[in-house]
């Protein structure tokens, strides 16, 4: 808060404008009105003043309110004593003083309807106006104060030589540099280097304003005291008042019995009220003692001390606390403390007290250098909750450590670290984290990588492991290490491109075979074999660890023209495996070898597969019009031929491979599998066409794509345990029709859809449709409506150790946890944030699973938002995941909660910060809405 009074120099050399200040010695003190005399400097250095006309022809002197002169030594008149006393700011109950101006213009307040377009763009959507600093001379002056002259302007002036008192009256303005003081009347005491301002006092400086009845200014230091004061910080939308405001020489402002709020002048929705409030513009923070948080002038919270921001700068201190209550934690209070250690690094401590669990200490350290950025974090809790005491892998000494880092040792060598470790797999299910970048997935990442970027190649050394954060999944493979080199040769003889991909990687995991107990200490028979880990369901060569070496050189000949392109390409993929398998896996592999879709174990396997493709396309366009709008319509046919011979790959385990889902883009891929462990055999011709409607300004109004693949042979290469003869789509002569349609009503409305229809079964294979509305000029309005259907999912069932195709079941028929079509997707999702009356919005979301006839999430509530505070009240139902069983469906249980969020703008969230997370995740457009809000 750069709140400063004019720091006039010791002898205050004055440039007098609009009035006359007599500084030369006179026999007697008298008043001279500038509008009645012409004055010039005489030869002796004094003033030579001549009347404009004979004195006896002067009209009677008019009486001007606010321009009458009084001597600094004269006693107050009886009339002054009987005048009404000014209204005190303490009587305003947090509002601006209407006695100073009915429309609060004395605080530079401008109603919303009077703001310019540029000012509206900088004003929050629910603010009734803004504090606009008026343009004035010198407001952008950056001249040092000790080098700046002082300008004084007044209607009339008087100087008493013997007392060395200068008196100014009528629209008094004193300015030095960027600072300006205004008043009805001023007395300047030259001998004491101080001044007195009386009546409608205003002191301005660099985006701040202090208004009062009287002020005392020390002219040589700039120290000042303003009585019955109101203050405003224009850009921060901050205002307040005090019995008096003191400005020290170093520009620190101290308020006696002061207030602080971001509410509009006519509102007392909330305010901080303290005996002593200090605002430090040098640090950008304020402090207050004996503070009460008042809502509608009713005290709701007390603290003996508080530390708060007055601008956007960082500073060490307590952040706004948050509290909540849940069944897992009980009442929870978080009191973060921020450490502003340096401009490029900081730290935050999050003490989190939970009545059911104890005190969780969590902290993070962030850093930023010229070549890197990242954060270190950790947490510790001695958990006194014993609900999981008997459950496998539970630890009551709970902890988490993490490190995220991205940087470059030079312009070519890049470094990356994403490492998280936790004490037990239930950490994120039971506890929350306030650290940035920490995600609660089924596994936590433990990765470090070095990347070298050459002129024509990229080399990468990667080490990646995973820590389990659930019991209901199979232990994944670690890559320890992985080396890749991908690039292109720097020369192109005859227009040919030569590229290559190489990889050497070690896959390793430690499958567990111990018993699993539930929270009661009983064996968990829900999913594992005989109460053992789910890892025991992994069988045969799927249990193998090993090394994989892959080399894939390619040669292509791109031929391009303005009307189209043709690119033939030949790639050769060579892969070598060195495998090791435990005794259990070898026995199971022997038994499985006779079954379709399974292979036998070999410690060394090599595979080489050629891949030939020809990608081609044409481009046509024409000018057209639709509904009175001119467009350029394009027509872009595409043809893609792919030939890959069949290679038996059933002896190869899956380390990082799965089958991709069918869509329009998959028509033009050279492998229907992700990863390297499977290369799909193909002999197909894909045909597709895309058309676009593009406006004259380049805006793409809509586009439509349709395509289909023609197969000339069956697709025999499959995932383990899957026989291509049992898959109709592996034997079909044609692929499903793939359609994509996108329509952009304008830059605010859009409709995105895709549809895949199987002509063999005459049924929908998959599809989705999503409508999104969010006006660019009013992003507070959000509407989302979507539907998605997929009956061709390919998933690994951890309870059986097999792959399921086509929306498969969970478990086997007859099992207690069997669920038919568990992996099939058929859902709708509707969400809306919509203003119903000014400052009131409705918030709702409904996500429903038709396949299992259940609601995944439903919430509804309202939001009140204005310029200084926000309130949200939301009733929410959702499917929660609490890992008490190895059977994933048993861990899915409905939960319900009523969430209240209160945000005091300028202080932060007081309660209910968790609301932000599920609104951000559940409603598309919510983050954009919040980013533009004040």
Swiss-Prot record:
Residues 1-33 form the signal peptide. Keywords: Cell outer membrane, Membrane, Signal. Residues 52-86 are annotated as: Disordered. It is found in: Cell outer membrane. GO terms for biological process: Gram-negative-bacterium-type cell outer membrane assembly; lipopolysaccharide transport. Gene3D superfamilies: Lipopolysaccharide (LPS) transport protein A like domain (2.60.450.10). InterPro entries: LipoPS_assembly_LptD (IPR020889), LptD (IPR050218), LptD_C (IPR007543), OstA-like_N (IPR005653). It comes from the Bacteria. The keyword Signal applies. Pfam families: LptD, LptD_N. One of its GO terms (cellular component) is cell outer membrane. Belongs to the LptD family. Component of the lipopolysaccharide transport and assembly complex. Interacts with LptE and LptA. Together with LptE, is involved in the assembly of lipopolysaccharide (LPS) at the surface of the outer membrane. This is LPS-assembly protein LptD. It comes from Pseudomonas putida (strain W619).
